[in-house]
């Protein structure tokens, strides 16, 4: 039996935790550089579309009294860890699926599972201020569906739905469109509806072998899961990522190569930290740059370069050298650049099989230096030690003009409580 605990409008809920005056005020959260909407509270959804550019909706926000915030990922990450820790304290095994979702193994848990779901919901809210929904079912896909129903009908469900009972499960399947099923995108929805598979129930009753032949094994597993056969296990340990990406919009348009190389060096440093954190090395790096998308008066340009590293590595010095050389090759003067991206590819574990018996490997001295770098930055803060090409305070850094305080991660911004 699986449970899915999903935070409600997570980013917006995080902003409300320390601003009780916004309890009934619609909220949107903006992407890096206050570019576009990436999160909306429930009461903001009728007025603002996901992904809407901020500069296009300022009048809408003002007209409907909607509060906007710059993204504060330090706050969101910290509150996410607190939510996950509470869930882990109440169930035997947890898979953290995303920053605001976790699957829980409820097999063999004593007592009523609906009551357990209510206890999880209550404790998370009491300890963090974050509202969550809980879906309980025999498979992961059904747990997703139960959670969706818990939120959609919250006034009737209290935010918890258990569909282990076949009759309840059948009702939910019949009253859920196929497009709302986990993993069914717009194109797949159109294909399935063309086959008269309109509801989740229709998909559960479809021939799984036919679905596999026409589409993929993924759709076959989805149908089997909806029918009650568990095909997806609980992954307690996150598998190493096969690609690692770091990209940001610049705080302002850049026209010179120097600042763009600084940005690429900075993003390479961030990506290499993630690479070393999972104990991996990479063989290739792809660097890309582009101009803005929304201004019709600006000349458009986008390009990328893929570089092969001399050997699989996680040494930020070597990676930065190759990444900055790559961006130098694709840079063209006369354009106003808005974004750069660094993508680490061909990720593997050190010492994995290679067909070249005499292939060069990363020197032990690099391993020791990178370990020391991560140890110092882990103790004294990110960026304490960095490569010389990474600036301390870049003038192209992210624009976050509406960011809330780091209430839980910075000593100088902690709340002060006075007792009288």
Which residues are covered by each model-predicted region?
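Residues that scaffold, gate, or flank divalent-cation-dependent active/transport sites
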Residues: 1-99, 103, 109, 226
């Amino acid at each position: 039996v699986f449970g899915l605990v999903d935070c409600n409008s997570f980013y917006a809920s995080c902003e409300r935790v320390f601003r009780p005056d916004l309890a009934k005020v619609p909220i949107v959260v903006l992407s890096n550089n206050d570019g576009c909407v990436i999160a909306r509270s429930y009461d903001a959804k009728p007025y603002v579309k996901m992904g809407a550019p901020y500069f296009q909706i300022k009048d809408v926000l003002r007209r409907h009294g909607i509060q906007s915030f710059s993204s504060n990922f330090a706050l969101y990450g910290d509150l996410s860890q607190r939510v996950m820790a509470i869930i882990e304290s109440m169930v035997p095994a947890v898979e953290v699926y995303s920053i605001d979702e976790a699957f829980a193994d409820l097999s063999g848990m004593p007592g009523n599972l609906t009551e357990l779901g209510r206890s999880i919901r209550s404790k998370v809210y009491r300890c963090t201020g974050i509202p969550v929904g809980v879906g309980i079912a025999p498979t992961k896909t059904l747990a997703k569906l139960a959670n969706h129903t818990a939120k959609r009908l919250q006034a009737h469900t209290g935010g918890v739905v258990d569909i282990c009972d076949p009759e309840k499960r059948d009702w939910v399947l019949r009253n859920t469109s196929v497009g709302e099923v986990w993993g069914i995108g717009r194109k797949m929805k159109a294909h399935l509806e063309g086959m008269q598979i309109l509801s989740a129930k229709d998909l559960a009753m479809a021939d799984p072998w036919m679905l596999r032949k026409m589409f993929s094994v993924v759709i076959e597993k989805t149908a089997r899961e909806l029918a009650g056969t568990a095909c997806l296990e609980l992954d307690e340990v996150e598998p190493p990522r096969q690609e690692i990406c770091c990209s940001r919009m610049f705080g302002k348009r850049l026209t010179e190569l120097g600042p763009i190389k600084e940005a690429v060096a900075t993003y390479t440093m961030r990506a290499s930290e993630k690479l070393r954190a999972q104990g991996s090395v990479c063989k290739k790096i792809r660097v890309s740059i582009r101009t803005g998308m929304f201004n019709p008066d600006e000349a458009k340009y986008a390009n990328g370069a893929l570089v092969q590293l001399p050997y699989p590595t996680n040494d930020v010095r070597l990676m930065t050298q190759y990444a900055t050389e790559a961006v130098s090759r694709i840079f063209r003067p006369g354009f106003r650049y808005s974004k750069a991206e660094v993508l680490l590819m061909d990720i593997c574990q050190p010492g994995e099989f290679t067909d070249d018996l005499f292939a060069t490997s990363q020197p032990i001295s690099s391993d020791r230096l990178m370990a020391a770098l991560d140890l110092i930055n882990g103790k004294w803060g990110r960026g304490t030690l960095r490569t010389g090409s990474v600036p301390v305070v870049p003038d192209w850094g992210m624009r976050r003009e509406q960011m809330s305080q780091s209430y839980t991660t910075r000593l100088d911004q902690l709340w002060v409580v006075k007792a009288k």
